[in-house]
Amino acid sequence: MSETYVLKADLRTRVGKGSSRELRRNGQIPAVIYGDKQEPLAIAVSYKEIFYKIHGGGFKTTVATIEVDGKKIQVLPKDYQLDPVRDFPQHVDFLRVSAKSVVHVNVPVHFKNEEAAPGIKRGGVLNVVRHDVELIVPANAIPEALEIDLSGLEIGDSVHISAVKLPKGATPAIQDRDFTIATIAAPAGLKSEENAEGTAEEAKDGE
């Protein structure tokens, strides 16, 4: 599980575009805390802290504690909006969570031991079908990433979700099939040779 962190926040008494612009001028951005059958709570958080958390990776898989109005609220970032031109954060949605909360979260996939995959050594290409996997997982057990070992994989081999070790209590959100996460694809040169051989064989059969 990722290391948790603390965010200090202020309550927002005003909402709307004018209020949001004023917050940004003062180094803050608007945010909201929702969920757990409670009323949404409008807050303002540090622009700088959110910027580094978002661009540092793992933002949406790490539980945080927000300190606001004398309270400590455990949350999981669920969504954020960026400026379409400059990638600056403009708004964040936080979901209230507790030790008993079970959440849907997209966890990034990391691959290791590429050098130990014979298929890649022979020039095969790692074709990533899914860069992240949606899990249903306890909020206190969200992994930073799913590690996939490529050792021993040959050209044409695939990695399916059934081969991935998941944290205790976690299940994939997609349950109706053993979906593919990655394959070792043949290099373009090898594909061309195979196609040429196949064409030659067909021509020979047609004689």
From Swiss-Prot:
GO biological process terms, semicolon-separated: translation
Transmembrane segments annotated in the record for this chain: none
Alphabetized UniProt keyword annotations: Ribonucleoprotein, Ribosomal protein, RNA-binding, rRNA-binding
One Pfam assignment: Ribosomal_TL5_C
GO MF, one example: 5S rRNA binding
A GO cellular component annotation in the UniProt record: cytosolic large ribosomal subunit
Keyword Nucleus: no
Keyword Plastid: no
Top-level taxon in the UniProt lineage: Bacteria
Assembly with partners or alone: Part of the 50S ribosomal subunit; part of the 5S rRNA/L5/L18/L25 subcomplex. Contacts the 5S rRNA. Binds to the 5S rRNA independently of L5 and L18.
Family: Belongs to the bacterial ribosomal protein bL25 family. CTC subfamily.
Purpose of the protein: This is one of the proteins that binds to the 5S RNA in the ribosome where it forms part of the central protuberance.
The name this protein goes by in its record: Large ribosomal subunit protein bL25
Source species: Brucella canis (strain ATCC 23365 / NCTC 10854 / RM-666)
